[in-house]
């Protein structure tokens, strides 16, 4: 009885085993298809366990019947035979358990083969989206590489489209603002460029409004700036060749305004040899007034007023580029003249400031040269050691300390008497102002200094050699005169006696 129960427990143990231990999966990696298959496997295992339990019960009943028959036949046998019976039974049951264990091993190996076959198609069926959702931060080497996010792909595609679109686009500046308000003017403007090639779209930018409102609200309500008569436009063609043909319209007049046409992908470079800088402009100045002012100097290629990107109001300066280099010399002669004298479209009396346009490379070089000159000026006239200390002080103190650093005093190299500098501590202590012209020689006594300053007195006169005569007191002078008072002395003594008598009388009273 005990052996059959042990065999049934073994069968149940192997039936429920899932094979070798696998890595625990995360919560996000649970596959619903695999869960369903595992549930089916568990149901099949339970059915097999029930069948095996029924077989074990039938075998137990047969064994009990055999034991009862043997007990009836062998009542008179010896004790040794009774002892041998369980040994014989054990040998039979061991053979049976070996056969059952062999069957269990075959079932176990078959199960493993089925699980391996099921796992291979499951890995192939997993999509890229399921991999993204699972565990992006896991470091396991068995996981497949993650794909690029769809958002980044969309951004890259959008940028590539914009770059491709720029090859088909042109910029048109100084366009009349009637293009926005009047539909007929808009159709005429579009037809002007449609004659060159088919136009895909037209966009208007740099529209200035009179009130600080959202752009869509201000555009719908048509609250445009009264002193800003022009806008900029972007025209997209369907053919790249049409862009080159549209560039020929640069400088053409539409509704009384000279248009500036340029490519977006390959804009024309500014040639500083053919360009002039115009300053001292009014903030509300228009390009058309500059076209009229400088057209007398030669053929103008374009006029560009630098404007604020938010308000679309000018910053007070512009660039005028000519088609010929010689026109620049004539344009420089307009320096200091009023713009109202040169153009009829403006009443502004500001005097223009015209100069040659500088190249960007030369400006950068000039800035670098200025910085070098500033650095060299601070270290000019210094020794090698002082320059090294100066550079160390700059790195330690920073910009603020660098600005405050004026004089360098190295430790152990203080000012000395031989350097021709006055000892300020001694001069302040004596109350004497330091004399920059006075030079103190080493080893000179005080008497020698006085001789050097005042000379040696002679015959009792200062500076002539000898000693000075001591000044006499008033009594000594009276004795020298023979005790006779002079008129001046009597006058001086008279009021004194009167004063003394008045004092004595006041005391007696």
Curated annotation (Swiss-Prot):
It is found in: Nucleus, Nucleolus. Involved in pre-25S rRNA processing. This is Nucleolar protein 12. It holds the Pfam family RRM_1. PROSITE patterns: RRM (PS50102). Residues 41-85, 136-150 have a biased composition (Acidic residues). Residues 28-40, 112-122, 361-389, 437-451, 478-503 have a biased composition (Basic and acidic residues). Signal peptide: none annotated. Residues 168-266, 274-359 form the RRM domain. Belongs to the RRM RBM34 family.
């Amino acid at each position: 009885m005990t052996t059959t129960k042990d065999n049934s427990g073994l069968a149940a143990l192997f039936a429920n085993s899932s094979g070798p231990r696998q890595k625990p999966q995360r919560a996000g990696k649970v596959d619903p298809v695999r869960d369903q298959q595992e549930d089916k496997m568990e149901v099949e295992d339970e059915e097999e366990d029930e069948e095996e339990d029924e077989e074990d019960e039938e075998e137990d009943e047969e064994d009990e019947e055999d034991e009862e028959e043997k007990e009836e036949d062998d009542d008179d046998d010896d004790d040794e035979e009774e002892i041998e019976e369980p040994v014989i039974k054990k040998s039979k049951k061991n053979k049976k358990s070996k056969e059952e264990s062999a069957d269990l091993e075959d079932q176990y190996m078959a199960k493993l083969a089925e699980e391996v076959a099921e796992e291979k198609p499951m890995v192939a069926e997993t999509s890229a989206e399921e991999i993204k959702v699972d565990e992006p931060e896991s470091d396991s080497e068995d996981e497949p590489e993650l794909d690029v996010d769809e958002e980044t792909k969309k951004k890259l595609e959008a940028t590539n489209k914009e770059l491709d679109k720029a090859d088909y686009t042109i910029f048109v500046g100084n366009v009349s603002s009637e293009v926005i308000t009047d539909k007929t003017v808009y159709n005429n403007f579009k037809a002007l460029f449609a004659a060159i090639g088919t136009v895909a779209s037209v966009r208007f930018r740099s529209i200035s409004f009179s009130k600080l409102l959202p752009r869509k609200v201000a555009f719908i309500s048509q609250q445009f700036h009264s002193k800003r008569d022009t806008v900029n436009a972007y025209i997209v063609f369907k053919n790249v060749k049409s862009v080159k043909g549209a560039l020929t319209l640069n400088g053409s007049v539409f509704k009384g305004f000279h248009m500036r046409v340029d490519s977006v992908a390959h804009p024309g470079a500014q040639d500083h040899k053919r360009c002039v800088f115009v300053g001292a402009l009014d903030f509300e100045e228009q390009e058309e007034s500059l076209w009229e002012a400088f057209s007398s100097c030669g053929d103008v290629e374009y006029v560009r007023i630098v404007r604020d990107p938010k308000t679309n109001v000018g910053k007070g300066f512009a660039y005028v580029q000519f088609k010929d280099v010689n026109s620049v010399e004539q344009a420089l002669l307009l320096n200091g003249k009023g713009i109202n004298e040169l153009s009829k479209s403006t009443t502004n009396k500001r005097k223009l400031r015209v100069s040659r346009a500088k190249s960007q490379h030369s400006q950068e070089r000039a800035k670098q040269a200025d910085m070098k000159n500033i650095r060299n000026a601070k270290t000019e006239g210094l020794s090698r050691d002082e320059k090294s200390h100066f550079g160390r002080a700059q790195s330690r103190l920073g910009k603020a300390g660098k600005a405050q650093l004026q004089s360098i005093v190295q430790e152990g190299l203080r000012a000395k008497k031989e350097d021709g500098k006055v000892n300020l501590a001694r001069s302040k202590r004596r109350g004497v102002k330091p004399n920059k012209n006075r030079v103190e020689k080493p080893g000179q006594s005080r008497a020698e200094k006085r001789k050097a300053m005042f000379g040696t007195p002679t015959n009792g006169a200062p500076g002539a050699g000898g000693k000075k005569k001591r000044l006499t007191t008033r009594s000594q002078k009276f004795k020298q005169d023979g005790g006779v008072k002079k008129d001046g002395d009597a006058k001086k003594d008279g009021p004194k006696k009167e004063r003394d008598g008045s004092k004595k009388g006041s005391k007696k009273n």
